[in-house]
Amino acid sequence: MKKFTTSLIAFFAVLGFAQANPGDTTWVQANNVRLDYFNNFDTTVTFPDGSVTYRKVLMEFTLGSYACPAGTQYCHQWDYTVLNYVMTPAGDTVELSRLITPFANSGWSRFPNTWKQPYLFDVTDYVSLLKNTASIRIHYSGYSGGFTANIRFAFIEGTPDRNVVGYDKLYEGYFAYGNPADPINNHFPVRNKTAPAGTTSAELKFLVTGHGSDTINQCCEFDNRTYDVLLNNTSVANKAIWRDNCGVNPLYPQGGTWVYDRSNWCPGALVDPIVHKLPGIAAGSSYSINLKFADYTATPSTKGYGGYEAHAAVIYYGPINKTLDASLEDIINPSVYPDHFRENPNSNTPKVKVHNSGSTPITSLQFSYGVKDSAQQQYTWNGTLAPLADAEISFPALSTLTSLSNSGASGTFGFRAKITSVNGQADEDATNDSLSSTFVAAPKWPGDVVLNLRTGNLGANGNLNQNPWHGVWKITDMAGNTVRQRNDASCNATYNDTVAMPAPGFYKITLSTPFCMGFHWWPYDGSSLQPGALIVKDLTGTNLPMKGYTYAGSTLTDRGEHDDFGCEYTQYFYVTSAGTSSIDELATSYGILVYPNPASDQIHISVSGISGKEATVSLVNALGQIVYTRQTREQQILVPTGHLPAGIYSLIYNAGDSRKVEKVVIAK
């Protein structure tokens, strides 16, 4: 056990966590083991003695891999359940956290020999168990090895949101579902409890994941089932045991079926507990509680019934300790933290997560933020944030981030954010007001890019060889205006679209598919479903690298991870000057007439050759700033210009895959 009086910088810097500037922090090293087969891996740990109050206790679980002995099958290649427990000398055994290992196939870009994936859990509610001497158990359910596990804890001194005054474990174990001879609800009987002294509120925390498969519904891993929380024999909640966002998992691509949604888990992701508020419970309250799963009779497979791994407990809280306080919880961007891999590198608009850690609703927050060792900007957010609630807040554009991308800067940089006032005044706890992160800047690209798209044969309606193809790409500016998109591609076709960015600034490429299987997904290699592929190039034909994206070979006969991004992919980039090439290359049979030119109060646009097609009309000044934009299907368009200063402007008319640009003069 080691104690520090500085920030958490050393603790999180290597992995890119947002770093706090808290009170004194005690760090405790726990397990550091190889997970070589199905087993319990126990480590005796000396924790703090409980004489100090902690604002927060964090558990960091770092997953990695090792080289298995020659001839070993499936080394770190399967999605196995990992349960993490604390076991006290008094006999308490409580599950602290849960995660599922990824399909970490060797040779894939996200899984080099040195790969590490951190998982961060807030275990503050269990601080009374994490004291003196206790054991931390990792239960690994794998039938092959190859993974490593490292657990350590950070005890951050200060005042927690609420004190935990008691804890009642209700249920724990793995229970088959759908067996008429042993209904699952037999294992979730009514529990009669009494809230301890000091209780002002109570919550049920339920860690549950479905595994295995029956014959018809693939229950429970791939089947969406529900349960009720019964408090005093009355349902206070009905919840589906389901996670619907596996296709946007930040740890991707993986070598298995990582895109499929599952029963409250995704491969390579931590498992979030399901939390239910229990109304009407206070000190001395006697109550009954149980969980009731929806009735279900399964047809067992050759491996039997599926089931649920469950751990449920009631946690009793005292009152909120602070009156007016906000906590800066996370920096979502800019950041290199792996859990924010899909959002980064981003543009010049930082985003943070804020928590109301007081009892007073928050209506305004003032922030200071900026790149380290540079001028800090100020921003005031106005809204409503209830006690103990969270919010994600985006800041206005930060000029220093623009400068870094404009210069093509490489390497890592530091970013800081700080809450400077809450509801117009200083809050009660300054130790939770600041965070910092490490980040890389968005890349600088040329103003003209070529998108080489080769489509497969899966139509957007799910049928083969029926147009349009299921994949879509879109380029937008930071105001959300569409610069160009290909959303009506034919199956089995090739497109080379040259796109000119209309002005200097940040842009975003978004790739998407309704089936959450990227433009290519390896399970279909060799089948009748043919893959697609996208490569982004400059005008010389040189590939422009996209973060976390593997380009295909020239013939699409290669296998593996190319174009495997799940539901959606984003790439931010910056251009220093507007492009020019697509104006002529994309000309079509339709035309636009712009008059008067010069103009004073308004510009009239007359469109001929097309009818009813949605288009975007933009007006860009000589500095590359978009001063007017609208979407329309009209053929006679009026653009107001009376409020604009005199000068030369570019009028841009985007209609689907085609683009027209006219120079106009505004004279006063």
Feature-to-residue mapping (PLM):
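Intrinsically disordered, low-complexity Pro/Gly/Ser/Thr-rich segments with frequent PxxP/GP/PP motifs
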Residues: 375-408
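Loop and turn regions of beta-sandwich accessory domains that flank beta-strands and are enriched
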Residues: 100-113, 243-244, 248-283, 293-300, ...
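Short glycine/proline/serine/threonine-rich loop/turn segments at secondary-structure transition edges
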Residues: 125-132, 401-414, 516-523, 647
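Extracellular/secretory-pathway and virion-surface proteins
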Residues: 19-326, 332-336, 340-346, 357-360, ...
